[in-house]
Amino acid sequence: MKWWRVLVLFIATQQICIAQKNVLLHIIKGDSLDVKYHKLFEHPDKYHFQVIYTEITRDSNNVAHLKKHYLYPPNNKYYYPASLVKLPLVALALEKIDSLHKIYGITKDTRLRVDSAYKCQTCEVNDSTSESNYPTIGNYIKRMLLVSDNYAYSRIYEFLTPRYINRRLHELGYKDAEVNQRFNAHCDSTSNRYTNPFTFLANDTTVLYRQPADSNMEDISNVAENTKLGKGWVEDKQIKPARDFRHNNYMPFKNENDILLSIVFPHDFPPAHRFKLSKEDYEFLYTYMGMLPRESSHPHYKQKDYPDNLKKYIYFGTTDSINDVSVRSMNIVGRAYGFLADCTYMIDTVSHAEFCLSVLLYLNEKNLLNDGKYQYYEIGLPFMRDLGHAVMDYEREKKRKYQPDLNKVEHLWDAK
């Protein structure tokens, strides 16, 4: 064989090996996404660009074996997680309810009352979105997972308290996680240390459990790198100095991806790193993580006000109406100040393709925060749509020794 043929064969073999080692990059290049979205790939630091793709291989017992592929090495550079923190909080809320159930008999559907004990706190005795017309932990969780409801998040934050949230996340192995704020512009960092009293009720007069007001005087600064974001902060039409997010919520993006995996595939994690949830808890989470807003009866959402893609970025992008519900995204998203993120477990119930994909982007060309001028629709959502389709196509064509049994989730989105 001539030398040049040997060289060509060697180069081709090396390229195949590289593609096999970096499946994610192989998928991206195969669909020319690195060309179409070249700015992201040329300046990954500028765009806080992170992608984590998890391949799922089933064995003969349908047990999932996970293999993660990173586009870039994980880092602790600060990004604003926004609503991504809702996923660990809904799991922690169910954990806490289960522990209280053993003593007081309360459940996620038990009626509750929220009182106030410090500035910026508000009371709540009724909830018109709930089937019972009363507030419940379960209904707050539904609102968070269906439409990323910030008010409901703040109530779950108050129920859990920041001390409990961070202690428990650290116990689970997420040592750099720091959740220390409501999503309420009227509450400053001091007010967020104080949480409301909660009362759980069997009826108008019978109290099952009282949770007193709480305060947390521990250090709430996060450990992220470079917590000053942007070149300025826009407020009252004026550009003010860059804001320091040292006392805001933070969770490494890798941790957020792992939390999703631990909820979808708990048995792939050691017991010490799993949420202590029941089978019913997991099914409840899967149902409302994958449901479209219009599919929910309680709470009820009109599609014209809450489009299908409200919190479905990967694969669906800017598609307001999703017609093919055989493809489901069980996910959590974040969007604020130019940051756009989605962490999802995706399934196709027809082809039985499944995978997890997490994407983080910073889309703020002016690098001014709080001016509302971000490139979500020009770059972010189209990229997440295209990458989602590229990975789904790859998974649909993949030869599998054992097909995943998706029966445990296929029935979850019947009318609720």
Model-predicted segments: where are they?
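Bacterial Sec-dependent N-terminal signal peptides
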Residues: 1-25
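Active-site-adjacent helix/loop patches that line small-molecule binding or acyl-intermediate pockets
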Residues: 21-33, 46, 116, 121-124, ...
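Structured C-terminal helix/loop/strand segments within mature extracytoplasmic catalytic/sensor domains
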Residues: 21-37, 41-43, 235-416
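A short, well-structured edge-of-sheet supersecondary motif
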Residues: 31-73, 357-359
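Extracytoplasmic
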Residues: 46-49, 74-76, 80-85, 107-109, ...
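Acidic helix-start/capping segments at beta-turn-to-alpha-helix junctions
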Residues: 54-57, 105-125, 160-161, 182-190, ...
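Active-site SXXK
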Residues: 80-107, 112, 357
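Short glycine/serine- and small hydrophobic-enriched flexible loop segments
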Residues: 91-99, 146, 150, 258-265, ...
